[in-house]
Amino acid sequence: MERVIDPEALPYRPCVGIVLINREGLIFAGQRIDSPVPAWQMPQGGIDADEKPRQAALRELQEETGIPEDLVEFVAKAPEWVTYDLPPDLLGRVWGGKYRGQRQKWFLFRYLGTDEQIGIATEHAEFSCWRWIGAEEMVASIVPFKRPVYERVVAMFREHLS
């Protein structure tokens, strides 16, 4: 018999998300390496027990894009945490089945380097390729269950985006 998971009984995974913009205000989008279909997203990841959210954002950015802290400029932090629930087909299959979704603190950083300095072939590779895109295309390119999160994040940082 298949185990039934009550999502209400599970916590949200503490996480950060990074909106990385270039000089033109375009957003870094990475194609997920583990997806058989196009699934573009912004860098994101969990917050370690001993980390502050901003530290986690800078660590995740380096792990996923190869971009060190000295090549970005902090622009803004989202005023609130944003949550999303996993769809039923993923519940119990990701993060060891311990979480119902993610609770994310989003940060906006401006990239100060060149495209050649971005290196997604990292030890913790998340992306197979990347590109700079506008805010509306970013929202349209995310998997549907995360789209409301991206809509809120874009709205929070709108003044800085192309």
Swiss-Prot record:
One of its GO terms (biological process) is ribose phosphate metabolic process. Its cofactor is a divalent metal cation. Keywords: Hydrolase. A motif (Nudix box) lies at residues 45-66. One of its GO terms (molecular function) is bis(5'-adenosyl)-pentaphosphatase activity. Its EC number is 3.6.1.-. Pfam families: NUDIX (PF00293). It comes from the Bacteria. SUPFAM superfamilies: Nudix. PROSITE patterns: NUDIX, NUDIX_BOX. Residues 11-155 form the Nudix hydrolase domain. Belongs to the Nudix hydrolase family. RppH subfamily. HAMAP family: Nudix_RppH. Accelerates the degradation of transcripts by removing pyrophosphate from the 5'-end of triphosphorylated RNA, leading to a more labile monophosphorylated state that can stimulate subsequent ribonuclease cleavage. PANTHER family: NUDIX HYDROLASE 26, CHLOROPLASTIC, UDP/ADP-SUGAR PYROPHOSPHATASE. This is RNA pyrophosphohydrolase. It comes from Cereibacter sphaeroides (strain ATCC 17025 / ATH 2.4.3) (Rhodobacter sphaeroides). The lineage of its organism: Bacteria, Pseudomonadati, Pseudomonadota, Alphaproteobacteria, Rhodobacterales. The gene is rppH.
